Amino acid sequence: VIEKYDLKIKGKANTGLALCGDEYKIRLFILENIYEQLYLNFPLGQIIREKLYDFQERLSMDALGFGFFYRFFVVMIQRMESGHTIKKLEPKYEELYGSSAYMIVDEFLNEIEQVKGYKISKEERLFLSISVAGMRTPANTAEIEQKISISEGVADLIIEILDRIKAELNVTVVANELFDDFVYHVFFMINRLKYGFHIYNPMVDDFKNKYSVAYKMAEIAKGVLEERVGIEMTEDEM
């Protein structure tokens, strides 16, 4: 499993093993594979927990979206406090700087600094921003629309996807009140794929078998996104 993260295990079983590689990729490996084993009951302290729940309320996050953010936060704090900080990130992550997701996280981490008594670097702020920019889409996007802004290009992508579905399947998907929800869904998904965070979907095979037309539509959407955005879409995201 660790090979796909470009990581290596060094040391010996009787003297201690260490995971070696890029710090960002180490964190992704932890988040996607062994979070529960390492951090299920991680002691954050009452004040930090209250600030986290205040953040959830301010952003109107549902349980899924908040769980996503919470995990990133716990991993960030533990890694930082054990001396494993992110020193450098690829240029694509810098694009988050100044985004609405970054500004939301920036304000929150300023509060955390006051509690913790140490500074949290821009690189760490960018790391946590990924959990907001790529959150699981809330059940109700009405509240999130006030805080997270998306580019017009995403809506254009959706329209192109609907046009392609009409052309290839002769199925008309009406852009109704669910359109905004779908725009945010695609926006968050693109960010997850762009920044390398993978979500496991146990329903893939079931979805393929029970909803073949919908799956075909998802395949068409995949083609448009890969062609226009230049990202590889995983089957789990479909």
Label for each model-derived stretch:
Residues 1-238:
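A cross-family "folded-core" feature that marks the main globular domain of proteins
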